[in-house]
Amino acid sequence: MNQVGLVGRFTKDPVLRYLSGNRVQTHFSLAINRNFKNIHGEVDTDFIFCTVWGRLAEHIVKYCGKGSLIGANGRIQTRSFVNEENTKIFMTEVVVEDVRFYQLKQRDSDDASIVTPPPPNEQKDLKDFVLP
């Protein structure tokens, strides 16, 4: 079984990417505080890279900005690619399949005021979650 649940804040505004075959995708990092203090008495933060596809990606880009607090459920995925220096890079990320909006902040807003989250979607369109 490959399942993960996260609650964290966006480190920056997510950006929607349009790919071939009418697919849309966004990726972002969530800042997640650990639930204990280190030997210096400080709380460490993990930065988890996440990827989202389809309508869910569109909703995230529309409603979430830097500092928004969300809950994300999905699966861990590893992949590799060759960068511009011809070095093979390995990456571990969470492919998000479900999101709960807890505290949303407007995108590109100086005062980062909270906005109302969209109503929960009772029926999922599973074709949006098919990966290439």
Predicted segments with their positions:
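Acidic, gly/ser/pro-rich intrinsically disordered tails
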Residues: 1, 18-21, 43, 101-132
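Core FKBP-type peptidyl-prolyl cis-trans isomerase
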Residues: 4-45, 80, 90
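OB-fold and OB-like beta-barrel modules that bind single-stranded nucleic acids
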Residues: 5-10, 30, 66-78, 96-99
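Activation segment
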Residues: 13, 33-35, 97-107
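Intrinsically disordered, low-complexity acidic/polar segments
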Residues: 17, 37-39, 59, 83, ...
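Beta-rich strand-turn-strand
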Residues: 53-89, 105
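Short aromatic/basic micro-patch
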Residues: 93
